[in-house]
Amino acid sequence: VHDDSLWNKPSVRQALGEALAFLTGDRWALSFVRRQHDVVEVGPRKLDLSIPDKIIMPYSDGLDSRAVAALVAAKENGGLVRVRLGTKGADTKGTPRKQRRFTAVPFDVKLGKRQRVESSARSRGFKFAMITGIAAQLAKVDRIVVTESGQGALGPIIASSGQIYPDYRVHPAFTQRIEKLFAAMGKSVPTYEYPRIWYTKGETLAAAHALEAAPTWHDTRSCWQDSRRVSFGGRRRQCGICAACMLRRMSMHTAGIVEASDEYIWENLGARDIHGGTVKG
């Protein structure tokens, strides 16, 4: 790290350890060493924005992200900065490039030959929380909006699977610990807001769909299956029957949004058998 004295402060290590332990259920022993070489600094660049930044939002381009981004942008009348881990995606195409409040954060971790990719997906929640917190520091913004509805934020701990440790990735109790970490580091403390936590996914989609400038939905993905399992006719579909697809379809139905049946491999949920439900061919 650049500032090993900061990261090795007992208060910082304790706050970081508590956040990680709460997220993963593991015990953490943390140590930090100073970098041997400084990172080349990039000069600051100014964005041509008429409205100052107000809110940071972690963005995945899924249903929740699109819906909540549209709702927040409409309510706040601008100033929303969407932050994505990775380089895929862009902001609204109709907006001039210099005015797009969309920041992609390249994130790459190289593993040794004997190391395995973390499989619980919980590191993703930590990365999103930290990157958006850092973005808030850089933009001098103290509000971070979390896009999850009640199912996403509270559901995983209410209905945990088997004997696994509860999933707190987007739970307010976890983001409160991230706030304490920034406070221990002596930084300005962002507040993580949950504007849709007391709504269902379907209610959130319905509210966004009712906006004058409603988002598009057909080009979002919810399915857990990869292209090898759900491709047909040279196009990648969604399976239609995994847990993520079922929540998507129920939420779309609740919101009154009609999807084309050919978005899914299992086109007809009302069919009696697999032959009547899946795409022909």
Per-segment meaning from a language model:
Residues 1-18, 23, 31-33:
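A short N-terminal interaction module
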Residues 19, 23-56, 63-281:
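Nucleotide-activated chemistry modules centered on ATP-dependent adenylation/adenylyltransferase
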